[in-house]
């Protein structure tokens, strides 16, 4: 009897297909408890995306936590011998705070981890599996690749204070050129140094041409070494790396990632569905000298591929609407004023109407007037195209 995969949701299909892919590449299934001793997360808090976890006192009196992360559990248990490389894949649920709802939420993940002796071949294999994981979704996808060494080497060369770095990296990730330049000046950099940091935002696009552009902007040997590693990755992958682009502004958490980082995107989903990178510092907390590389695919995000569009986005081909979520208050008023001056005013008086949705059919623009805290939720769930 042949299995009809069309009856499954995108996340269910991916789970079945990727299990075959990962096991064929030599990865073994890793199973872990839903709980870990809280001390594991307390001692490694800097490696967590959020320090908030749900804790409880178990029947034996020990303080435990509902698992917010799978990688920590694998790194703790892998313990590879010298020269050994251990390969695991997993399908697990984790529990993390949601920035949108301000509550804890369950997140379904499928991913893999490669821990131990990792060379250029092993690194290329993990990236190839990330590319094939995205390709299995059968929708347009792209994998954006970067290297933490390129960014951190520039910060070192510019003598950026350690306290200022997390904010600068956040602005790099957000591709916020204006705020990045201002924050760089505020951190003590001069105009030339601030411009050098902001220029990283232009280093994205096709792998080969972006790599060439980045070489011309290197200010130290460590940056050149990072680009050599990226060139080596491209050479190892060959034709298998066709779905890969380079984005050197893709900076991960400095406490976690120390080399290659990458994010995967699919058409129809507003944020990354796959994230991964090199995390030697975490692996070495449990196994001295070990290297580590892996990624996670966020299965919940894949369900968007089969979900019906919100009514406001069920558009015909005759007209395309731009749906904008505006916060009530002065920020929303200012943003609306700029848009109205550009010809995108609503047909009703924005400041006098009690309606929560106003629009201009001629201009093809629709505004949702929402609480500031709800702007991100409207965009996350696809009700609005952009939020301000």
PLM ranges: what are they?
Residues 1-4, 216-219, 268, 359-364:
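Short, basic, glycine/proline-bearing loop/turn elements
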Residues 1-67, 124:
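TRNA-binding/sensing appendages of the translation machinery
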Residues 7-25, 36-37, 71-82, 89-140, ...:
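Positively charged, Gly/Ser-enriched RNA/tRNA-binding surfaces
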Residues 28-32, 243-244, 341-349:
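Short secondary-structure junctions
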Residues 32-51, 146-156, 250-259:
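Beta-rich nucleic-acid/ligand-interaction surfaces
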Residues 52-58, 160-182, 189:
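Acidic, His- and aromatic-enriched active-site or binding-groove loops in soluble protein domains
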Residues 52-98, 372-387:
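Glycine-rich, N-terminal phosphate-binding loop and its surrounding beta-alpha-beta segment
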Residues 316-388:
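Domain-level signature for soluble enzymes in the chorismate/prephenate branch of the shikimate pathway
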